[in-house]
Amino acid sequence: MNHLIFLQSIMNLRGVGRKKSYAIVNQLQLDKSVNVSENEFIEQFSSIKEFKLYKIEINELRQCIDAAKRIFDEHAKNNISSVAFFENDFPKKLLEIKDPPVLLFYKGNISKLNNANGIAVVGARKPSLNSYDVSNSYAQIIAENNLGIISGLAKGCDTAAHKGALEKKGFTVAVMPCSLDDESIYPKENIDLFHAILEEDN
């Protein structure tokens, strides 16, 4: 059981969110080198205060491990990669926010998030034609100045910004609130844009 399954198992536990996950990771001194059996994981987790505090049963812990394995099995089928907050590839700026994620799931070249500067674009999902054109034009200018465009692949201004960056062969990042398999991508009308971003090795 590697560090990613270990972390996801913790995140699956009842009453354990991101902040508690960070505390548990620190207590267990978890890092990328961890490779333990299910029984070793249960033994380690049983030794910390959260286990007693939330009155978590052993069978519940096993269910969380099984659920984590299913997640990563599905990710493997869909070429979805993962990175933990303590790994070098994890976006450093993301660690500066108040409540950073413990795990990040991604497709494409995540190293660009650490090696290049970017500008976030947020706008209306139903913009006027002028607003759409402005978002697209600004994104092109930003891309021409070697800055990335970070947006959410939503309809409207997000779409315009991603397309503007791609038109100038710039890099763009789509931050998604859903899984990254084709069936889950939303909105469906942006599935081609999603793949265009990946094809540019972004």
Please state what every model-predicted region is.
Residues 85-202:
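Glycine-biased, small-residue-rich flexible motifs in mid-sequence functional cores and linkers
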Residues 1-136, 140:
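Short, positively charged patches
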